[in-house]
């Protein structure tokens, strides 16, 4: 284990850290003594800031100063155990304050609260989560899974095996929290269990427990039972930049669910172009990652293909580089694929072309010239014809999705303009491509 350096661990008590899905924002609880309340614990946040770039162009980072969450901290209360939602818009935490619920003896209990991020990036007033999450017992240590709808927390309410137990609560499609469920034995015991976190793929959980056989408070793990699993999600992450290596001003990045056309905007870090987002897999839809910027080329790729079993690992997207399409240079849109030795466009490629057609119809001054290329496998004349048929198939698809035919042209260049020597399967895959040239129409 390595202790974090400044601004952490500067002599006071720290704990309960929660980090954003892009790893650039961290929330933590720390002792913040006041004259009236020396043991006061408050919530703080810090950002992972770009300090400089080295000689190779790599970014150097540093955690910024801890900033107290003034709207959430109370002078005479206790705020700790933060849990940031995967979209960065909600912050859950535990607190004992003047508005807390009271038990049968009239004592204030530990409760779970939630704050919404405002448009200016600050945190709004905290709200006490409703029953069945909070009770007149002590409820603490919230963990909201990246699916955004599954909350795990610790409580000493009944029924209980004794001490604090881990509980599960799911939010339905209407936003209502369903009945909370105790995870039961052997996860919960007559000791204390709390601090549970669940992996993004929902398969494994980690928690702290003080039970028979442990040496005090120890860390344990277990496979998540089916009835307590969160919804299926994956993390999509990468970087976006222009060809000059800078961050395109006004660049837009979003997820589009192919069937419902639902759009989810992804925030791009202005310093280094990094991004990360959660993609829902339970919708039964293909999902596109689309990037646009004024004056720069459209790009899209399929990050969820419903005909393939989603991998458990995160989806690390190759760096997105937006080219300048109006300087006479051709550009590629990733994942435009065809059946072998055919002009039949692949299923997911059709989805990408539909999104590209939408982009062109929104930008009426733009035309597009489509260029087909092949590798050198087969006869040169056959490759020439195949490239023409593939380019025409793409042109037809764009027209079918509403782009006026007058704004579309196409040609095939066969194997005449390879990007790499045709020496192996990898180089040939580079040469089999469809390029696009954007033109300005009068």
Predicted feature residues:
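Loop/turn elements at helix/coil->beta-strand transitions in domains of secreted/extracellular proteins
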Residues: 24, 89, 149, 363-367, ...
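Extracytoplasmic
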Residues: 21, 109, 333, 365, ...
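Periplasmic OmpA-like peptidoglycan-binding domain that tethers envelope proteins to the cell wall
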Residues: 155, 160, 371-442
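Solvent-exposed, polar/charged alpha-helical surfaces in well-ordered, non-transmembrane soluble domains
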Residues: 6, 21-24, 67, 86-89, ...
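Short, conserved micro-motifs composed of acidic
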Residues: 1-239, 243-249, 265, 269, ...
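Structural recognition of the beta-strand scaffold that forms the well-ordered cores
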Residues: 83, 197, 337, 344, ...
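Periplasmic peptidoglycan-binding/tethering modules of Gram-negative envelope proteins
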Residues: 227-367, 440-442
């Amino acid at each position: 284990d390595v202790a974090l350096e400044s601004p952490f661990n500067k002599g006071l008590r720290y704990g309960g850290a929660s980090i954003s899905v892009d790893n650039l924002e961290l929330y933590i609880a720390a002792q913040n003594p006041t004259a009236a309340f020396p043991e006061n614990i408050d919530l703080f946040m810090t950002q992972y800031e770009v300090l400089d770039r080295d000689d190779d162009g790599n970014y150097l980072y540093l955690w910024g100063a801890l900033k107290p969450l003034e709207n959430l901290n109370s002078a005479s209360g206790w705020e700790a155990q933060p849990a940031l939602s995967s979209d960065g818009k909600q912050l859950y935490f535990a607190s004992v304050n003047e508005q807390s619920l009271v038990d049968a003896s009239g004592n204030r209990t530990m409760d779970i609260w939630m704050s919404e991020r405002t448009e200016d990036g600050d945190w709004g007033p905290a709200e006490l989560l409703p029953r069945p999450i909070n009770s007149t017992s002590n409820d603490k240590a919230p963990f909201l899974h990246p699916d955004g709808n599954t909350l795990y927390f610790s409580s000493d309410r009944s029924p209980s095996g004794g001490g604090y137990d881990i509980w599960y609560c799911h939010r339905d499609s209407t936003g209502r929290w369903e009945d909370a469920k105790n995870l039961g034995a052997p996860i919960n015991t007559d000791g204390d269990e709390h601090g549970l976190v669940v992996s993004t793929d929902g398969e494994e959980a980690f928690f702290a427990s003080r039970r028979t056989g442990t040496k005090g408070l120890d860390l344990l793990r277990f496979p998540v039972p089916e009835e307590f699993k969160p919804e299926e999600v994956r993390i999509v992450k990468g970087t976006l930049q222009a060809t000059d290596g800078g961050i395109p001003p006004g660049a837009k990045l979003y997820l589009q669910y192919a069937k419902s056309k639902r759009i989810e905007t992804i925030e791009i870090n202005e310093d280094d172009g990094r991004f990360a987002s959660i993609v829902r897999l339970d919708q039964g839809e293909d999902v596109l990652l689309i990037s646009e910027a004024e004056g720069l080329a459209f790009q899209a790729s399929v990050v969820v293909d419903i005909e393939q079993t989603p991998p458990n690992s995160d989806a690390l997207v190759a760096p997105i580089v937006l080219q300048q399409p109006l300087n006479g240079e051709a550009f590629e849109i990733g994942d435009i694929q065809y059946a072998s030795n055919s002009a039949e466009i692949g299923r997911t490629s059709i989805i990408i072309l539909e999104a590209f057609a939408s982009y062109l119809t929104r930008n009426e001054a733009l035309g597009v010239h489509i260029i087909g290329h092949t590798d050198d496998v087969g006869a040169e004349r056959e490759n020439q014809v195949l490239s023409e048929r593939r380019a025409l198939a793409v042109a037809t698809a764009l027209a079918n999705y509403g782009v006026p035919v007058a704004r579309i042209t196409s040609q095939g260049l066969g194997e005449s303009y390879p990007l790499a020597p045709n020496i192996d399967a990898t180089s040939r895959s580079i040469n089999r491509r469809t390029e696009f040239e954007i033109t300005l129409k009068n």
